[in-house]
Amino acid sequence: MQKALSFLKPYSLLAGIALILMLTELAVELMQPLLIAKIIDDGILKQDLRHVWIWGTVMIGLTVLSFAAGMLNSFYAAHVSQSFSYDTRKGLFQKIQSFSYSTFGQFSSSSYITRLTNDVTQVQNMIFMSLRFMLRAPLMIAGGIVLSLAVNVKLGFFLLVTIPILILFLLWVLRKGGALFRSVQKRLDQVNTIMQENLIAIKLIKALLRGSHEVKRFIKANTRLMEKTVSAFQLVEFTMPVLMLLMNLCILLILWAGSYSITSGSTQVGDVVAIINYATRITGALSMFPFLIMIFTRAKASGDRIGEVLETEGDEREEGTISDRLSGRIEFQHVSFRYPEMDREALRNVSFSAKPRETIAILGATGSGKSTLFQLIPRLYQPDSGRIYIDEKPVQDIPAEGLRRQIGYVPQEVLLFSGTIKENIAWGKENASLDEIMDAAKLAQIHETILKLPNGYDTVLGQRGVNLSGGQKQRISIARALIRKPAILLLDDSTSALDLQTEAKLLEAISTYHCTTLIITQKITTAMKADQILLLEDGELIEKGTHSELLSESQLYKRIYESQFGREGSESC
């Protein structure tokens, strides 16, 4: 919570002004019972109309002052809370952007979304309520007790005894409610996870008729959220009857003792009225506590969740550029890597080298470590053992930012952003000109297809490029990587949806490009054009060589070849 509230520091002056205005409003409210007592004792009971007019005018003036202070307090409280919300979301987003793949995986995507939206909103609401009401309520209680004792010690004593009992009860509710609302936020994460998965996989769900199954899954998670939320709210709502019961008993005792004191002549009517007035105002302040407790406990749970992200060790941001363009030489020396919280190594003792402008094809079954190998090159992960060299320099000695600026990476899962085709291609390079965008599209063999669309490069894509075919999305992703003019190009099964003719044109265009290309593929037709082929199995590099070398020396490669071309194909080679 403390970490989250650090974003309030720039607005401490404005928050201070809001508090002063709130105290002004509170002071006026605490003075009103005393003025009413004056009007009753010195005006009404003595039939002195002048006192009624004088103190009545003072009350009206103070009420106007209180109204103005309240309006300004609301303005500053809203400004501070909204500014806090903006800065916190910005800080959280920047923090998440600094995470490596392994650090990012500590929380689920839906959990990040909940923390950036719902959790920040909960703390924002608490800040607004603190500057507007949350601090005012306890101050009203304390001020009401003190002034009640100042008016009449005997009658004020009833409040002095009752209020601490209620405060102890409220502290118990606060502690119990905090645990419940933390559980509510976790259940909300689970609901958000299911919603996110369903929105992403809606086509698959409809195609396989799994809608009813997913509805049941959602209802189950949503029911658990509802049950936990109801439990939390029931606890909070339980406080109101208890508060009202004890405070009403206290007011009855004050009335009973006050009437006895008035009869005996030891107390004036105005004093009893003033203390009853303070008691009702304190009751009003206490009646807000269930609502304030709910806000605070939810904000406390949310603030702790925000703090978890902010306190997570981010990866050291290695800013900087590389003075010269990389030649693209890559060397792996006995590299091993295991994902966090996984027992089995994803890569084990892998060694190979790629010369500048070479094309390396990587083959292997699912889970053999192909994509993992790619992710080590731009330092998305760090190897557990072994060394990786780029241009004969240890990769960890090259600034991460400068290294990644010279790498074009097309991941296995195509991801297009909302916006136009032009914006999606230009996303790979800031301030890219239209000519650069079109050149990259031509290399990726997508230029002619784009021109056939109604709005050409200004065609707006649906969510995740839903209005494009798989092959079109892959080629736009490749164009986005090529616009960077990379020294190293990593294609993670990025041509799987292309027909053989289009893929051949694409690879031929890339071969004229001055970059080292590593391509993960399942197609022998793609691999056989490469300068070198790496064959991975269960995280180990078991074979490497050219197409003809592997076809004659590797039984596994030969089986893959025959599965695609038949036994006659391998014999003819």
From Swiss-Prot:
Its main location: membrane. It is a multi-pass membrane protein. One of its GO terms (cellular component) is plasma membrane. InterPro entries: AAA+_ATPase (IPR003593), ABC1_TM_dom (IPR011527), ABC1_TM_sf (IPR036640), ABC_transporter-like_ATP-bd (IPR003439), ABC_transporter-like_CS (IPR017871), P-loop_NTPase (IPR027417), Type_1_exporter (IPR039421). Residues 15-298 form the ABC transmembrane type-1 domain. The keyword Lyase does not apply. Keywords: ATP-binding, Cell membrane, Membrane, Nucleotide-binding, Transmembrane, Transmembrane helix, Transport. Pfam families: ABC_membrane, ABC_tran. PROSITE patterns: ABC_TM1F, ABC_TRANSPORTER_1, ABC_TRANSPORTER_2. One of its GO terms (biological process) is transmembrane transport. It is found in: Cell membrane. The chain crosses the membrane at residues 17-37, 52-72, 127-147, 153-173, 238-258, 275-295. SMART domains: AAA (SM00382). GO terms for molecular function: ABC-type transporter activity; ATP binding; ATP hydrolysis activity; ATPase-coupled transmembrane transporter activity. ATP binds at residues 364-371. Residues 330-563 form the ABC transporter domain. Belongs to the ABC transporter superfamily. This is Uncharacterized ABC transporter ATP-binding protein YfiB.
